[in-house]
Amino acid sequence: MANYQNASNRNSSNKLVAPGAQAAIDQMKFEIASEFGVNLGPDATARANGSVGGEITKRLVQLAEQNLGGKY
């Protein structure tokens, strides 16, 4: 698991806005992968990895909406 995380961090061009958020994002990624029965890594299919990424996005949007709580 750690090797995959390190490789993904090196290849990512996305910059996190909140310091320390990488650990939380990685934890969310592996929890969702576990829920979906996906083994993340270089041998996983793009469809399997994409399903995890899509679910991360969905959950992050839900969290943001809850935090905004009708402020906008």
From Swiss-Prot:
Q: Name one Pfam family in it.
A: SASP
Q: Which GO terms describe its biological process?
A: DNA topological change; sporulation resulting in formation of a cellular spore
Recorded GO molecular functions are: double-stranded DNA binding
Which positions does the site annotation Cleavage cover?
Answer: E31, I32
Which InterPro entries does the entry link to? SASP_alpha/beta-type, SASP_alpha/beta-type_CS, SASP_DNA-binding, SASP_sf_alpha/beta
Kindly state which keywords UniProt assigns to this record, in alphabetical order. DNA-binding, Sporulation
Q: What is the role of this chain?
A: SASP are bound to spore DNA. They are double-stranded DNA-binding proteins that cause DNA to change to an a-like conformation. They protect the DNA backbone from chemical and enzymatic cleavage and are thus involved in dormant spore's high resistance to UV light.
Leftover remarks: SASP are degraded in the first minutes of spore germination and provide amino acids for both new protein synthesis and metabolism.
Q: What's this protein's family per the entry?
A: Belongs to the alpha/beta-type SASP family.
Q: What is this protein called?
A: Small, acid-soluble spore protein C
Q: What gene is this protein translated from?
A: sasP-C
